[in-house]
């Protein structure tokens, strides 16, 4: 068996969810869209369901996967629905939906639902992606709030730059949301992961932690709050070949690395097809049996190479850690000029191994 694998620590996932609840002082929907950011949506939801207030996914297909796996907790569709026919499935499977466009609001107003629906009305407070204008938001509130097919409304918006702690845009969005939603008696949802970790003055009834659940820091620097996160995924492999090269010999495609001295090179079963960043620069830290070794040469589809010259004990079969507690995925992403979101969601081929499942089956552990 190829040695590449991702270890998923479900107890760390539960720890991070509890941290989100504690920081938010509110209910929290665990965001498990995109296959739980590459961690496995079903397994993560099963681990969290005993204590989670609910889950959030991007679309109905992701929600139905959870329902079919036996998840009975509330599930919110963050993008709402795309076709009128989906409303029947939303009602049938007891899902919650976002309404972020006038078309979605109109469809909800006209839908004869067999059961009242819980709708999250989304304001565009400055993200300018999904969301209603302030005028349409107020009109939607007035149109939907008294309808028999609407069980309740939650008012929400999405923060665009909360991962920039010195940016005023987050406060501006919070003010815009408060001004527009003022006088509307309903629960609210504002804070995402960076909003929870970096903006303690923000308040809402429902938070939506995503990236932080998986132990990744959304900021370029550590803070008191991010230091409490526990990495959920550890990406591991092993050395599958070792060779000795004289000074002046190149390694890999494009000869991006050239040995400046007699060099011992280790080949690791991990490449960009596995989700490791293709353009990670020379010197990117790779943990070889607990010792940092520098990446040496361009990452290939299935393999990468590291300089083992200063680690003579390393040999074929030696374990390698690509990210986890060290190096952390956020730091690796910054070094490679990508985002932690992209790295985590990009793991398609690597098999996942889950730890901490016994605690999930036996109930909540504190």
Curated annotation (Swiss-Prot):
Binding site for substrate: 129, 301
Active site feature: 33, 253
Top-level lineage group: Bacteria
Positions of transmembrane segments: none
Cofactor(s) named in the record: pyridoxal 5'-phosphate
GO cellular component labels: cytosol
Gene3D superfamilies: Alanine racemase, Lyase, Ornithine Decarboxylase, Chain A, domain 1
Pfam family, one: Ala_racemase_C
Known pathway: Amino-acid biosynthesis; D-alanine biosynthesis; D-alanine from L-alanine: step 1/1
Residues recorded with modification N6-(pyridoxal phosphate)lysine: 33
EC code: 5.1.1.1
MF annotations from Gene Ontology: alanine racemase activity; pyridoxal phosphate binding
Record's catalysed reaction(s): L-alanine = D-alanine
Keyword tags: Isomerase, Pyridoxal phosphate
GO biological process: D-alanine biosynthetic process
Function: Catalyzes the interconversion of L-alanine and D-alanine. May also act on other amino acids.
Family: Belongs to the alanine racemase family.
Protein name: Alanine racemase
Record organism: Xanthomonas axonopodis pv. citri (strain 306)
Gene designation: alr
């Amino acid at each position: 068996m190829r040695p590449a694998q991702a270890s998923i620590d479900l107890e760390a996932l539960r720890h991070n969810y509890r941290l989100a609840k504690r920081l938010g002082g509110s209910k929290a929907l665990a965001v498990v869209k995109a296959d739980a950011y590459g961690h496995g949506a079903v397994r993560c939801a099963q681990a969290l369901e005993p204590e989670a207030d609910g889950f959030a996914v991007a679309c109905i297909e992701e929600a139905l996967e959870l329902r079919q796996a036996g998840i009975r907790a509330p599930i919110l569709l963050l993008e709402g629905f795309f076709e009128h026919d989906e409303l029947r499935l939303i009602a049938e499977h007891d899902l919650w939906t976002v309404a972020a466009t006038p078309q979605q609001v109109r469809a909800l107003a006209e839908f004869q639902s067999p059961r009242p629906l819980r709708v999250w009305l989304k304001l565009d407070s400055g993200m300018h992606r999904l969301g209603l204008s302030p005028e349409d938001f107020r009109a939607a509130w007035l149109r939907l709030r008294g309808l028999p097919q609407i069980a309740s409304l939650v008012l929400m918006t999405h923060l665009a730059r909360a991962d920039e702690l010195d940016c005023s845009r987050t406060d501006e969005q919070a003010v815009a949301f408060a001004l527009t939603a003022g006088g509307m008696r309903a629960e609210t949802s504002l804070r995402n992961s960076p909003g929870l970790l970096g903006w303690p003055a923000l308040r809402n009834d429902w938070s939506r932690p995503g990236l932080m659940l998986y132990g990744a820091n959304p900021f370029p620097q550590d803070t008191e709050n991010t230091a409490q996160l526990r990495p959920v995924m550890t990406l591991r492999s092993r050395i599958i070949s070792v060779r000795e090269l004289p000074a002046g010999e190149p390694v890999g495609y494009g000869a991006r690395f050239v040995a400046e001295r007699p060099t011992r090179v280790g080949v690791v079963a991990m490449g960009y097809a596995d989700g490791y960043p293709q353009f990670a620069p020379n010197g990117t830290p790779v943990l070889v049996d607990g010792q940092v070794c520098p990446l040496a040469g361009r990452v290939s589809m299935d393999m990468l190479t590291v300089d083992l010259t200063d680690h003579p004990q390393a040999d074929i079969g030696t374990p390698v850690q690509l990210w986890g507690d060290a190096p952390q995925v956020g730091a690796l992403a910054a070094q490679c000029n990508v985002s932690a979101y992209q790295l985590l969601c990009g793991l398609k081929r690597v098999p996942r191994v889950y730890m901490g499942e016994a605690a999930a089956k036996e109930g909540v552990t504190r």
